[in-house]
Structures are given as C-alpha cells and as structure tokens.
Design a protein with these regions (language model features):
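A compositional/biophysical signature of low hydrophobicity enriched in polar/charged and small residues
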Residues: 2-181
Length: 181
C-alpha cells in the first residue's frame, strides 16, 4: 500500500513524496512532485508557448506583477520544474540521420545506460521495461556516422547483448508544449 507525505519544500512549492515499499525504494528514492497553482500553470504554459516571452507580458497574462513572475520563474527553474533552452533543428545543422536504438543488456543496465549517455551523438537515454532494456536517441551526420556509432561503439560496450535501430524517416510531431495538466 502506498501513502504519501505532503509538506512544504524549501522552494515554497507543495511537494508530495511517495512512500514505497523497500523493493521499489531503489527506483523511487528521488521522486518528488511539485504541485502548481493555477497561476504557476499559466506561467509555465506562457513559457511553453514562447520561452523568450518577457516577464512583463507574462505578468499581464496571469495577473501578477513582473517581479512576482520573475521570482516564480526562478523558483520553477531552481526546483527543476522548467528549463528554458533553445531547441535546434538537427537537419538545419547538418545532422541528416536520427534514430532510436533499442538496446538489450546483460548485466548492470545502469552502467550501460550511463556509458551511452556519455556519447556525444546520444541526446536521450531511458531505461525501460519491455523488449529493450534501454532506448537511445542518436543524432548523426549521415548513415555512415550512424553505422559507426551503433556498429563500432554502442555494440562494443561491455554488457550490450544486442541492438535494434529504428531510423527516423519523417518526423510528424515533436512538441514541447504538453502543458501542465
């Protein structure tokens, strides 16, 4: 049975930290959720629409002062709730081949995932449950670069049993504005 601890965190947000059985502790030890009020959600949605939007514009939209918005955004960033970054288009930068690589692992999955995360071509690594132990997104200059990455570097890692590569043919959707629900 799972219960939750609710309390005020150091950053001023309400936090919920799940209490789990010992068998799940390893996976959930760092899980902390931030509950946003309606104004916090509105600020996040404004920034998801345009990460360069001024604090003054956001303040008008959400009904706060510019200083209050600036403080809330700073707290959201410090809490790790949001990041404000430039998202590039790999094709425009000469990276014409992207792929998802499913990796099956013998041994310590975390060690393999950490080694994959160190590769500069890899921009996404997730440990999964299912057919693959790890999924990796790779951004490469061309097919030869992808072949070298998968064939010579990923498959050569100790613990990698097999890989399956899913080459991206045409991107149909990639959004970062899923909201705050």
């Amino acid at each position: 049975m799972q219960s939750a601890f609710r309390g005020r965190s150091d950053n001023g947000f309400m936090s919920i930290r799940p209490r789990r059985s010992a068998s799940l502790e390893r996976v959930t030890a760092t899980a902390t959720h931030v509950l946003l009020d309606d104004v916090g959600k509105a600020i996040v949605e404004q920034l998801q629409d345009d990460g360069r939007r001024s604090y003054a514009t956001i303040a008008r939209a959400v009904g706060l002062s510019e200083a209050a918005v600036r403080q809330r955004v700073a707290r959201l960033q410090e809490a790790g709730v949001i990041q404000i970054v430039a998202v590039t288009d790999p094709l425009q930068l000469g990276f014409r081949r992207q792929a998802m690589v499913g990796v099956r692992v013998d041994g310590d999955v975390v060690v393999v995932a950490d080694a994959l995360a160190e590769m500069p071509e890899v921009d996404y690594v997730v440990i999964t449950a299912g057919s693959f132990d790890v999924l990796v997104e790779a951004v490469c200059e061309d097919d030869d670069h992808l072949l070298e990455l998968v064939g010579r570097r990923i498959r050569a890692l100790p613990g990698v049993r097999s890989t399956e590569t899913f080459v991206y043919m045409k991107l149909r959707k990639q959004h970062y504005n899923w909201g705050t629900r």
